Amino acid sequence: GLSPRTDRAGATALIECLKTIGYKGEIVKTPEGVLHFKTECSLLDEETFLVTRRMEQSGIFDGFKKIVLPKGEEPAANVIRINESLLVSSNYPQTIDLLDQNGYFVVPIKTAEIQKIDAGLSCMSLRWFAVK
């Protein structure tokens, strides 16, 4: 998304990279006050997003199922999905319960140290597919 951190050239370059591996993308603007999308939403499965109230109201995810974060737990939006597991900050018990109630396998992760530098799980991770 277009934001203070990503301009149209960067977003266009990402879409071109996605095309080379068979994916498509769409450029959208982040809602006012949103640093970047991973700050306020995460893809939980092929049709469901975990979102803050602000992202739900933006209309960006119309057509998708949305699970809205409990008030006060907005930083929990930064979730990492690995296969069928969701890595979620252990600091947000209501979010963990909400995801569990919706049938997701949740792995709580301690994040106190990375939160001191205003980072989320995806900011502090490297993920790649193993080449077989």
What are these model-derived regions, one by one?
Residues G1-K132:
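Histidine/cysteine-enriched polar flanking segments
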